[in-house]
From Swiss-Prot:
The keyword Electron transport does not apply. NCBIfam families: PRK00104.1-2. Keywords: Cell cycle, Cell division, Chromosome partition, Cytoplasm. GO terms for cellular component: cytoplasm. Component of a cohesin-like complex composed of ScpA, ScpB and the Smc homodimer, in which ScpA and ScpB bind to the head domain of Smc. The presence of the three proteins is required for the association of the complex with DNA. This is Segregation and condensation protein A. The lineage of its organism: Bacteria, Bacillati, Bacillota, Bacilli, Lactobacillales. InterPro entries: ScpA (IPR003768). Belongs to the ScpA family. Participates in chromosomal partition during cell division. May act via the formation of a condensin-like complex containing Smc and ScpB that pull DNA away from mid-cell into both cell halves. It comes from the Bacteria. Transmembrane segments: none annotated. The keyword Cytoplasm applies.
Length: 235
């Protein structure tokens, strides 16, 4: 099965997406938390053997530097530091956010004018629908990447587990469906609770995407950072 996740427009676009979930000013976000989410996303892409563009890896190295500096004991400087990579990054994000908002406004104005001067193309509507769909899948993927990062930490502290390579998506679809035998909904955490290896988690996630694609389950989240709910589709 070929699973494709729509990529972001670049590392700043991914970071802005992560920052926007906190619903605060860019300069007030918990930067270490955002960095950990970004690095978890990149690590999950690599674990799934998906291609990661060089610009994302370059940003990852810059973020690791910022994170390490944030975790060091704070030292009072007699003179202000001119080269602050964290403030430089936040300034870039703020500038990118303004540019993106302006681009969206111009695109909306263009579509409004097109209603009066020409017949709107069907392709535009189709592309918008795809963007909306992929965005929800990307949110699910970002949540999964954070869970996988946490699970790997737990497994590294436990006994050595031998990786099994023959997990099948079809089998994992059955595993997920069993969660709905006695109830109509479950949480993402419950589905992944018994996973023992990285391969098992990845295959289970791909099975979940397939069930969503087949309209057998839906994904809900009441608010940012709240539990992700999986619900059985009514037939």
């Amino acid at each position: 099965m070929d699973i494709k996740l729509k990529d972001f427009e670049g590392p700043l676009d991914l970071l802005l997406h992560l920052v926007s979930k906190y619903e605060v000013d860019i300069y007030d976000v918990p930067i270490v938390e955002v960095i950990e989410q970004y690095l978890a996303y990149i690590a999950t892409l690599q674990a799934m053997r998906l291609e990661v563009a060089g610009e994302y890896m370059l940003m990852a190295s810059q973020l690791m530097l910022i994170k390490s500096r944030n975790l060091l004991p704070k030292v009072v400087e007699s003179t202000p530091i001119e080269d602050d990579p964290e403030m430089e990054l936040l300034s870039q994000l703020e500038e990118y956010r303004r540019f993106k908002v302006l681009s969206e406004e111009l695109a909306n104005q263009h579509q409004e004018r097109a209603k009066y001067f020409s017949k709107p193309k069907q392709e535009v509507i189709f592309e918008d629908a795809i963007l909306l769909h992929d965005k929800s899948v990307m949110d699910l993927f970002l949540t999964f990447s954070q869970m996988m990062s946490q699970k790997q930490k737990e497994l590294s502290n436990s006994q050595t587990v031998i990786e099994k390579e023959d997990y099948r998506i079809e089998d994992m679809m059955i595993v997920i469906e069993r969660h709905f035998n006695l109830k109509k909904k479950t949480t993402l955490q419950e589905v992944f609770a018994d996973c023992q290896t990285k391969s098992e988690m990845i295959t289970l996630f791909l099975a979940m995407l397939e069930l969503i694609k087949l309209h057998q389950i839906t994904v809900e989240q009441d608010s940012n950072f709240s539990q992700v709910i999986l619900r059985k589709e009514e037939k």
